[in-house]
């Protein structure tokens, strides 16, 4: 059986964002699997995405070990593949939250030699609002939604480059977006494995 991972954890970028480079031992095998999945359009995100699909037990175990080191226990993980082409657009947002659980997102970049600026960025709104909890406290969701596509209203506080076989994990309550899209089809587009990770403190 092939070894699945090279699990080298890098220094955290911020309290809420960290990276594992060279996550898969054989990333082209995972990429080939992703290329052969069925993708569908949905109204709530750009690009096309698979349904929630089977997750490799080894990946689950690695994530479980990683989050335990932060005193967090995984309750569930939703696992998808997604790709976006250059003719699509994105917006700044936070992900849906299950109350009583903290939610993290994970992205594994699966396009070889991708543009470095095709990664992921975290943002702060002009009023200092950084996440859904701030938005609820300040009761300014209408302003946030109205300006989700206006970059002049946001300050970029972290960005992560699109490096093949890199996993980035971040707190999905925080405002974020993909950066540049690229490519024309699944073969050369921004292909990724997308994880939504639901955790609770130990």
Regions found by a protein language model. Name each.
Residues 2-94, 119, 126:
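Non-heme Fe(II)/2-oxoglutarate
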Residues 87-202:
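Catalytic core of non-heme Fe(II) oxygenases with the double-stranded beta-helix
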């Amino acid at each position: 059986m092939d070894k699945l991972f090279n699990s080298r954890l890098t220094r955290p970028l911020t309290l809420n964002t960290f990276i594992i480079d060279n996550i898969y031992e054989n990333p082209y095998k995972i990429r080939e699997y992703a290329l052969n999945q069925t993708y569908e359009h949905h109204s709530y995100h750009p690009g096309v995405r698979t349904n929630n699909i089977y997750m490799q037990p080894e990946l689950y175990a690695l994530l479980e070990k990683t989050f335990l080191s932060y005193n967090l226990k995984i309750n569930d993980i939703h696992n998808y593949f997604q790709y976006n082409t250059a003719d699509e657009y994105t917006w700044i947002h936070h992900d849906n939250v299950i109350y009583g659980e903290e939610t993290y997102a994970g992205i594994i970049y699966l396009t070889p030699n991708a543009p470095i600026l095709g990664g992921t960025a975290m943002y702060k709104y002009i009023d200092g609002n950084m996440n859904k909890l701030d938005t609820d406290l300040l009761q300014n969701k209408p302003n946030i939604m109205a300006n989700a596509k206006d970059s002049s209203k946001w300050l970029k506080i972290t960005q992560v480059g699109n490096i093949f076989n890199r996993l980035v994990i971040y707190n999905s309550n925080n405002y974020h977006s993909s950066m540049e899209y690229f490519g024309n089809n699944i073969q050369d587009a921004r292909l990724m494995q997308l994880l939504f990770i639901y955790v609770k403190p130990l």
